[in-house]
Amino acid sequence: MLAFRAIAPDGSPVDGFSFDGNTVTYERDEHVEAGIRAELELPETDDPRWLVPGVFYGENRVESCTRLYPRFTPGRADVERMESDAWSFRADRCSTPAVFSGGRGLVTSEVSPLGQAGVGFALRNGRPVVWLDFPYREEPLRYDGSETPAPRDVQTYRWQPGESVELDVREGDLSSLRRAAPFVDPGWVPVEEAAALAAFGLHRWHYRADPPRLLETVGFDREGDRDAMHVSWVSGVPYAYALLRHGSRVGNREYAAAAEAVLDHVASSLAPSGTFWAQWTATRGWTTGWHPDHSRLHARTLADATLFLHRSGPRWEEAVRSNLDVACRTQREDGALPSAHHVETGDAVSWEGTAGIAWIPALVEAGRLEEARRAGEYYGRFDIFSGAPEDVDLAPTSEDGYAAVMAFVALEDWEAARRAADWMLTFRYTYDVEFSPQTLLGRYEFKTRGADQASPANQHLHAFGLICLPEMVRLARVTGEQWYEQTTRENLACFRQFVARHDGDFGARRGMTTERYYQTDVFEAKGGVLPLSHAWTGGVLLYGCEAALELGL
């Protein structure tokens, strides 16, 4: 049953309020500082299956995960390790301001008459309890993106005698994550122009010829470039492929030649394992990437490079085959593929998480269907995916969702693909965050609907969802589920904002795009962007635009 109460900053009850539906009235003669909590108790369970969209997934962090960020631990709390049996968060962290247990819960809007709203949950005597706070409370700590817990952030409202407000409190299920409101395309430029700008930026600012590479990051102010290239993920093959595809379509031989040179560089530099290396750096040459264990190569990094190199053409077939041979040789009897491979032998060094799912599309497209299907049967058992990016260890991320969608669509396993897409879309913003007009995002009236939260560990918006644009469109058209195509249109529209149209546009150079849009109080102040251009952000926008043009999206 839904119940309302007024609470003081310390959580104790405050008297003098009446509640009629969602209307709250303060009836005392003196002002008071208090918040309002709407709380829903759910049936007893031993697995509450928490979901705060974009923020919290089940226990949220497995015990073996090396990256610290909020984790659910029944019956105990350790704030220094960001572990607790009760959590509260501000609404703008959430891709939809909502909280669920077992698919049931409460939904609200980001902003209320009392200030920004909040969500929270706890397990009390075996019963999940979910709530909405007006205004928000962040407890038992405030997560600022670092591994050091910040003090809790508790907001209250100053009530005047006789004041009455109407709050947005709705009971709901996971269908609440499908936004039905009309959508107005906020893109600054049409798809064709966005492709041209992204291609220009990728070639002009990120490409270097000796050796051929796409720099992972370059500064808006032309300071602090990172002279390194992953073979995929944050640089490398997928984005060289996009540049090659664009250059071929528009007849720009300079773009195509640069892309081919990057692909040649990657394909001709295999590790002793027979796979690609993970990363090239100016100081160390070819090396293993960002994981602290320098004997391991991350499977998703290798697999995406293999997939997009295969798509680039038969010229690089030998390198593709070498990588797939390693993946197949190391596949377990139950179908699992390694999450990481040893740099010398190619043998599995980790099975944790689901990063190995990224091999499936490459296996399918190369005709290795038996191995791909066995892997699909294994990964089809999962309802939470984790471990795709190199930088957050075993955290669940939106990138895991993209990898799962790409895998199951490649297999034409439409039921698994729908489940993967629905999970992935829990990271997608269904509303436009309110920004102060005194911030960069506020001045440019940035619309967040269609953007994805990177992960519970990295709470910023990013454009990586464009990597699975073709698969989402195919899924929509095969199943008749037009919501998948609509949200994919929104995803592409969102990131046709903030592609620099000219030098000086939002402080960037023409064609630059950023990795991070700060929609909440994490890493940097809300309303800013990271003033770096990334090869992957321009590359994935270019890829998404080229695919959209081909598909008539």
Show where each model-derived region lies.
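Active-site lining segments of carbohydrate-active enzymes
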Residues: 285-294, 307-365, 422-428
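Well-ordered alpha-helical segments within folded domains of soluble proteins
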Residues: 228-248, 293-311, 346-365, 393-410, ...
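Beta-strand-rich recognition/accessory modules
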Residues: 87-188
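Low-complexity, Ser/Thr/Pro/Gly-enriched N-terminal "stalk/linker" regions
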Residues: 9, 126-129, 163, 173-231, ...
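Polysaccharide-binding surfaces and accessory modules of carbohydrate-active proteins
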Residues: 2-125
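Active-site neighborhood of glycoside hydrolase catalytic domains
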Residues: 359-363, 374-385, 400-434, 464-492
